[in-house]
């Protein structure tokens, strides 16, 4: 008997037609990359992906975070022989918790005697004969004994849910506006889960935001890296722009004008590094600048798609995802970001584009943006 991990990938990949092979290859490459510090062997059996791993538990923990993997099963490989399958199925039943079970059989090898239903009945009868306190429940069992008969037979009961989604790196790229808050890391995670490659930009307002605030953002990027691999982080100085806006624009327009500057800078950085889009952690109506009118005015400053994956999510739901992915505790550390230090008491919630453009005429937009882009620091996380 050999213990393996059966990797099941997202059903969406099956729907990719002629492109299915491209998605499978990318997922396989991502799996190999995340297992590079674990001794393993990739085994293919009639379209199924099995991984022989030196450390099963470590392998499970790593594979759970691979986008595109939706389930991991701990399987025992035996010879495709009915007696061997019976013995292993009985062991699985004895190791499982519960008083009811169901046997599910898949015969990829149609030369194996009997139908799938007949094999399930025979295995179920054998388990009942040897474990009298168990009973069969075909509708709502406490546990399953799963059997797949291929070149070998694979028996398993333990299934671990993974992150699902699409293989990372199969759906273009984006530049995430990463602040130190709760929302933006979750937005980045959700885009990455759909296969979008992440790059991040952070706007730093020294000395009003501390070096510790910058370190906090690096830590958040590092947590996201656990799901994606290396991330490019661009750190843009934003103090001079904020000072100019405060000095020359109306106080109730500060936030929306700052957001428009961020959009301009993000788009120029994106263009410079061949990044297709921009992503933000904005949610409709969550704060004053995230009204429908505010988002429309912000968007007007962008020259490429701006994605907002949290747009219809409640704050409680966003916080729940942040806890699940491991960013929440870092996000709530008490360090200010550039969007919170100069917030006006009564920000404009329904800005009008022409009024904002008129206010911006007091600023040398091109010079301010160019200087910020030129002084942007690059880090590989």
UniProtKB/Swiss-Prot annotation:
UniProt binding sites for ATP: 177-178, 202-203, 259, 281, 290
Catalyzed reactions per annotation: [ThiI sulfur-carrier protein]-S-sulfanyl-L-cysteine + a uridine in tRNA + 2 reduced [2Fe-2S]-[ferredoxin] + ATP + H(+) = [ThiI sulfur-carrier protein]-L-cysteine + a 4-thiouridine in tRNA + 2 oxidized [2Fe-2S]-[ferredoxin] + AMP + diphosphate; [ThiS sulfur-carrier protein]-C-terminal Gly-Gly-AMP + S-sulfanyl-L-cysteinyl-[cysteine desulfurase] + AH2 = [ThiS sulfur-carrier protein]-C-terminal-Gly-aminoethanethioate + L-cysteinyl-[cysteine desulfurase] + A + AMP + 2 H(+)
UniProt enzyme class: transferase
A GO CC annotation given for this chain: cytosol
Database matches in InterPro entries: Rossmann-like_a/b/a_fold, ThiI_AANH, ThiI_fer, ThiI_N, THUMP_dom, THUMP_ThiI, tRNA_STrfase, tRNA_sulfurtransferase_ThiI
UniProt subcellular location: Cytoplasm
Function: Catalyzes the ATP-dependent transfer of a sulfur to tRNA to produce 4-thiouridine in position 8 of tRNAs, which functions as a near-UV photosensor. Also catalyzes the transfer of sulfur to the sulfur carrier protein ThiS, forming ThiS-thiocarboxylate. This is a step in the synthesis of thiazole, in the thiamine biosynthesis pathway. The sulfur is donated as persulfide by IscS.
Name listed for the protein in its UniProt record: Probable tRNA sulfurtransferase
Species annotation: Clostridium kluyveri (strain ATCC 8527 / DSM 555 / NBRC 12016 / NCIMB 10680 / K1)
Gene it is expressed from: thiI
């Amino acid at each position: 008997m050999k213990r393996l991990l059966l990797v099941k990938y997202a059903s969406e990949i099956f729907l990719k037609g002629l492109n299915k092979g491209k998605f499978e290859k990318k997922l396989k490459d991502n799996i190999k990359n995340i297992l590079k510090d674990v001794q393993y062997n990739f085994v293919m059996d009639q379209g199924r992906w099995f991984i022989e791993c030196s450390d099963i538990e470590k392998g499970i923990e790593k594979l759970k975070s691979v986008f595109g993997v939706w389930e991991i099963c701990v399987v025992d490989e035996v010879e495709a022989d009915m007696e061997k399958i019976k013995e292993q199925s009985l062991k699985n039943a004895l190791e499982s918790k519960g008083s009811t079970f169901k046997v599910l059989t898949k015969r990829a090898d149609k030369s194996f005697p009997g139908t799938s239903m007949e094999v399930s009945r025979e295995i179920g009868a054998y388990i009942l004969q040897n474990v009298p306190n168990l009973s069969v429940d075909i509708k709502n069992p406490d546990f399953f004994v799963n059997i797949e008969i291929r070149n070998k037979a694979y028996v398993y009961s333990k299934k671990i849910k993974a992150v699902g989604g699409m293989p990372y790196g199969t759906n273009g790229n984006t530049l995430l506006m990463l602040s130190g808050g709760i929302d933006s890391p979750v937005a980045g995670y959700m885009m990455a889960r759909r296969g979008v490659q992440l790059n991040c930009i952070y706007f730093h307002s020294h000395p009003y935001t501390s070096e510790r605030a910058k370190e906090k953002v690096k830590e958040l990027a590092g947590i996201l890296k656990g799901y994606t691999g290396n991330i490019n982080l661009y750190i843009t100085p934003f103090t001079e722009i904020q000072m100019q806006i405060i000095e020359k624009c109306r106080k109730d327009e500060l936030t929306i004008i700052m957001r428009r500057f961020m959009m301009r800078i993000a788009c120029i950085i994106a263009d410079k590094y061949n990044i297709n889009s921009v992503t933000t952690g904005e949610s409709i109506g969550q704060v004053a600048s995230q009204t429908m009118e505010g988002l429309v005015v912000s968007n007007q400053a962008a020259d490429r798609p701006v994605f907002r994956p949290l747009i219809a999510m409640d704050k409680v739901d966003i916080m729940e995802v942040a806890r699940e992915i491991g960013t929440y505790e870092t996000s709530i550390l008490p360090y200010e970001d550039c969007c919170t230090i100069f917030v006006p008491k009564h920000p404009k919630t329904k800005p009008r584009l022409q009024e904002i453009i008129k206010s911006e005429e007091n600023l040398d937009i091109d010079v301010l943006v160019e200087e910020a882009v030129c002084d942007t620091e690059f880090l590989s996380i």
